[in-house]
């Protein structure tokens, strides 16, 4: 049986495209199925989400040809400061601090907004002849056979491959259809995510406060902006989310 591709990846977040590029650059024919339409995945509208990328992650993106597309949009992390604290009372007087002078390779990491990284992955895959992107489609069935596996999409289209890879998140339909069991639990916390602009420079320092309700991270972005990740107990986070701008 002739396969449509060597590897079929389900999931278009970050892991799926990264793996697709790595396999394609190794000479394999890859198809990636993404439930989101192209216009949504490639949209660069501001949504407040950002990633802290370790130096190893930045090197991986560079090797895949993705970093070159976003290097000018990333904020180097030049230091990390961590302390205990309480919201409204500020940090404790004792803290841990690390700076990039302690490593030889360069910055400790980089902050990069999700909207830019998503678009960079999308464009890099579009430029790779060994990758076929199938957007706005969901898988409803997967059937293994002697030569590989065949999946059926909601549109009725079928795709076959030697290998099926699930990169479709923690509630993976790929894993569920394969009968792979997962164990999980909740922490009773919700993360509130946003970005702010401020007058004083952050100097590339990432701040982390460990509060009774959960950690509060203030992470540097370009142009005197910072990404906020505030974890609180579910009930408290729900109350905060319901507040209006005046509050």
Q: Where do the model's predicted regions map?
A:
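Glycine-rich FAD pyrophosphate-binding loop
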Residues: 24-49
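Short beta-strand/turn micro-motifs composed of small residues
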Residues: 11, 34, 81-84, 196
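N-terminal FAD cofactor-binding segment of flavoenzymes
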Residues: 45-87
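Rossmann-fold NAD(P)-dependent oxidoreductase module
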Residues: 22, 120, 124, 195
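Conserved Rossmann-like nucleotide-cofactor binding loop
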Residues: 15, 38, 171
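Conserved N-terminal helical subregion
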Residues: 4, 73-177, 185-190, 245
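N-terminal Rossmann-like FAD-binding beta1-loop-alpha1 element of flavoenzymes
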Residues: 5-32
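Conserved FAD-binding catalytic core of PHBH/FMO-like flavoproteins
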Residues: 61, 150, 167-247
């Amino acid at each position: 049986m002739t396969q449509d591709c060597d590897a079929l990846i389900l999931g278009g977040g970050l892991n799926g495209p990264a793996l697709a590029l790595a396999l394609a650059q190794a000479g394999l024919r890859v198809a990636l199925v993404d439930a989101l339409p192209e216009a949504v995945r490639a949209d660069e509208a501001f949504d407040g989400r950002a990633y802290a990328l370790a130096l190893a992650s930045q090197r991986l993106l560079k090797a895949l040809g993705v970093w070159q597309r976003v290097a000018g949009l990333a904020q180097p992390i030049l230091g990390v400061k961590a302390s205990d604290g309480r919201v409204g009372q500020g940090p404790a007087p004792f803290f841990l601090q690390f700076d990039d002078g302690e490593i030889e390779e360069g910055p400790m990491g980089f902050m990069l907004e999700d909207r830019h990284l998503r678009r960079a992955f999308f464009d890099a895959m579009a430029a790779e002849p060994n990758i076929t992107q199938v957007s706005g489609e969901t898988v409803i069935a997967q059937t293994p056979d002697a030569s590989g596996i065949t999946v059926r999409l909601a549109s009725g289209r079928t795709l076959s491959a030697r290998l099926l890879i699930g990169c479709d998140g923690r509630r993976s339909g790929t894993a569920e259809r394969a009968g792979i069991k997962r164990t999980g639990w909740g922490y009773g916390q919700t993360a509130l995510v946003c970005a702010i602009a401020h007058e004083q420079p952050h100097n590339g320092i990432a701040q982390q406060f460990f509060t009774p309700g959960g950690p509060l991270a203030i992470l540097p972005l370009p142009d005197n902006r910072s990404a906020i990740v505030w974890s609180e107990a579910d009930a408290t986070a729900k109350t905060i989310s319901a507040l209006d701008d005046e509050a």
